[in-house]
Structure formats: C-alpha cells, structure tokens
C-alpha cells in the first residue's frame, strides 16, 4: 500500500449489504446519486469521490494503485468486511486494481 493514502469524501444511502460505486474520470459521487437512491432499498450504497475529484483531497499522485489504496482505507475506516463493487471508466479500473489486491474483500 502506498504511504500517501487520501481520506475520501463519500455519500451514503440506504440499508443492506454494502455496495460501493466508483465514478469515472472528471466525475464525482454526484453522478450516481439517482441510481444510489433507487438501489437504497436493497443495499447500503457508498459513493466516494476519488482523489482529485469532487470533495476529496487533491494530489499530484494519480494512479490506480494509489486510488485502490484510498478505497481500501475507506472500506476499512467504515469497518466493512466485504463489499459489492462497481465502477465506471476510471472507476472500473480502480475497482479492478482493488479486486486484484484484495479479492477476499469482495462478494
């Protein structure tokens, strides 16, 4: 894990198994609010702003390894043991990086 982990801003909706949805490049958690509200009857939906996006901190470091480490830190801070994970575009690549590093944390 990198030593420059960012504490990510996130939005939370609903109750149920945890589902994290990651936005794409130049997006933010705002992009997924409508869908999160629809899914909130079945899931607890977490919408983080990835580093350098939305309300999360900014850094010169912007790579998938670092972004997946940021997500790992968020999941641990929230005390989530396992998550469902979805991502669009850049968020999809972050999700793949996370899945390769921590497959045991995914349903």
Task: List each model region and its residues.
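Short, well-ordered alpha-helices that flank and scaffold nucleotide-derived cofactor binding pockets
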Residues: 34-37, 41, 73, 100-104
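Conserved hydrolase catalytic core segment
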Residues: 81-107
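N-terminal cap/lid segment of alpha/beta-hydrolase-fold proteins
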Residues: 1-7
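Conserved HGGG/HGGXW glycine-rich cap/lid loop of the alpha/beta-hydrolase fold
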Residues: 9-58
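Active-site acidic short loop of glycosyltransferases
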Residues: 5, 14-16, 41, 79-82, ...
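Active-site loop/oxyanion-hole signature of alpha/beta-hydrolase fold enzymes
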Residues: 36-37, 46-86
